[in-house]
Amino acid sequence: MFNRRLTISILVTAILLAMVFSVNANQVPKATWVDEVIIVEEPSVTTAVSRLQAGDLDVYATTSSEPVPFATIRNDPNLDYYQTFGSYSELTFNPVGPEFTDGRLNPFGIRKIREASNMLIDRDYIAQELYGGLALPKYNMLNNAYVDYSRVVETARALEVKYAYNFDAAKDVIHAEMIEAGATLVNGKWHYAGKPIEILILARSEDQRRLVGDYIAEQLDKVGFVTTVDYRSGAEASPIWMMGDPWEGKWHVYTGGWGAGAVYRDQGHIFDQMYTRRTMSQPLWQALEPIPELDEISEKLYYKRFTTMEERKELYSRALELAFEDSPRIYTVDQISYVARRADISVASDLAQGVSSTALWPSTLRRGDEIGGTVKIGSQQVLVEPWNPVGGSNWTFDQLPMRATFDRGFISNPFTGNYLPHRIAKVEVTVKEGLPVAKSPDSDWVTLEFVPEIEVPGDAWLYWDPSLQRFVTVAEKYPEGLKAPRKSVIHYRDDLFDTVTWHDGSPYTVGDMLLPQVLSWDRGFEESPVYDPAEAANLKSAINNARGWKILSLDPFVYEVYSESWYIDAEQNLGDLFAVYYNYGAQPWHTLVLGMLAEMNGELAFTASKANSLDAEWLGYNTGPSLPILDKHLDYAIANNYLPYESFLREFISEEEIASRYANAKAWYQDKGHFWIGNGPMYLEKAYPVERMVHLKRYENYSEPADKWAMFDEPRIAEVELSGPARVNAGTEIKFQIDIAFKGEAYPLEHIQEVKYIVLDANGNVAYSGYGTGVADGYFEIVLTGEETAQLPIGSNTIEAIVLPTLVGGATFDSHTFVTLP
């Protein structure tokens, strides 16, 4: 006989437990849906897809353009993918010279040879054959899916025609320049000082860039060079091309690849980053000698020294022309990439670079409707270079785990690239009348005002003076007064200092905002104990362009910033003292201090270039030989209750906070064995450099719910079809139709920003450009008048439509060919 009472008791208990689990299941956790994430290295996308099929991986975060694995994903119902548009490939040249330090001639130290190399390569061949059709030919640094490309499409297309594949023209230029440089052609091979000139090509071994390395070697061989291809992984190649001294001549060409860190609504920074010394601290960039006019225009675009969109277009167009002439790198393809995942996994994916380029991935990562558990992510590389927020790794592979560990004042919309408030409550933007700044109707957290002029208050802080150990004020530098084209007042949430904590338990304070500000200036001055020559390259420009900032309230924290620079989108006209004022990651003031002490002592350096010059270790807070050195300086800081820039920071950081901070860091290091202390939704449990693995865990004290950004489920990428007559008689009007949809449904007119078109005539020249007219949801028309068709040469023409929706930051293209008849 069974015990009825016991059975009922068990049943009731089971029901109660089920109710508890049901309630818990409906509760939204803080920070993340999952408990932990394991990131492992998997170099091969083919193997990664097999591991996804087997359930050994849940997401493969590295974007790929390989066609065979893509076909596998599309044919497996258990797998799915996200599409991205931000990956692109290039050929990076070693531009120093014309001779290396050992006297060898460097052909790519000759500007005209670099320029001619644009015509030496067939980008269509690379896109179709080497990338299997999952790429588009790329001629300049602008991503053709982003809005800036469409703004200058006429110039861009003309340059694409000028620098299209023309082997004979490239060969003629190279031959003339080599003769001019003193080289001789012996039995079909170039010699210098009696020795053959050998071109050393570093080719990435993990993907199609291996094939690109072989291809460029073949092309260079045809114009008379002996070539050697050295196949290396990214981690193996980086110390040579990026961190090594380019004057040593250990390489000539590198098959580079880049991933846009966001959906760029404004790529005005890109010329400064890729063609000048001002943005990148690595030795290769510090060796650049840009064309002076390009250098000047790059700075103008970076600081927005224009007043109209037409003036901006002229600067952009001229910069594109000069970029081809300078060509320290030439672009090959924009990749049509995918991020593979298991179908039951959901996670925010940025249209630029997928999962790894959005700050939202840790909060949105989830397996079905589950709460908790572990998700395993694969990455082509893991722990490539040291992590530090001043001058550490900028590899996408390192950014993936790093982005999970730090918080921000604003979030970049992964579909449009525009900003959304996170720790910021509101922003008041004031700009000078006439500037082309606009606000999205949905951005109720931003106000926009236009005024005749903006006067900077005399007590605003301008820049740091290391000799005075304080900020120079506007009144001191500009007693006659100072004006700025833009002012922004940033209001942080009232609960900022109550809810945000660092992973070691330290409450977030104003000191975490101020020390990075001081350090960023101080590193540029020779008299500073943390002086870095790479930072000095930008110092003069930074001082001249500084317009000041001022704290209006400490709690709640409110400050105003004046700027020479401004952005077309009102939402992007802000500063964020809370977030990442350095490029890569965030650290609390008390661990930044440890790096400073180690650099002052010559043991570690924040940047690779300074580490090379000091023969010191490149600082890494996450793992490696830096850690015991940092721990040693932590002991010093504890013993002395050390505070840098004491005369300035003492007003904001108390003795009690100093002692508490260092004690927390010590306890953290003793527990975790590293100093990577963030304030984001996940924390670094441990980095395993030998095993190539990173272990992240949910940060229990993170204040924000995991579903805060759940709206970013799927980007509404437009599907475009351009159609029209196949023939037109010159002098006759012709109409073209553009059908725009998403998943078969007509795209609403209110969500289409613009439809632009260009007409390429039979000679490949841009004949006309303009804008289509919206007729109905999902339907636009383009009309070429009889006068316009009369001017087209007889023969085949191509019309291209460029559709820019408002719901995503990427454009969609389609084209149609028609013949002009007499």
Question: At which residue positions do the language-model features occur?
Answer:
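Long beta-strand-rich cores associated with HINT superfamily self-processing modules
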Residues: 275, 339-386, 393-397, 683-684, ...
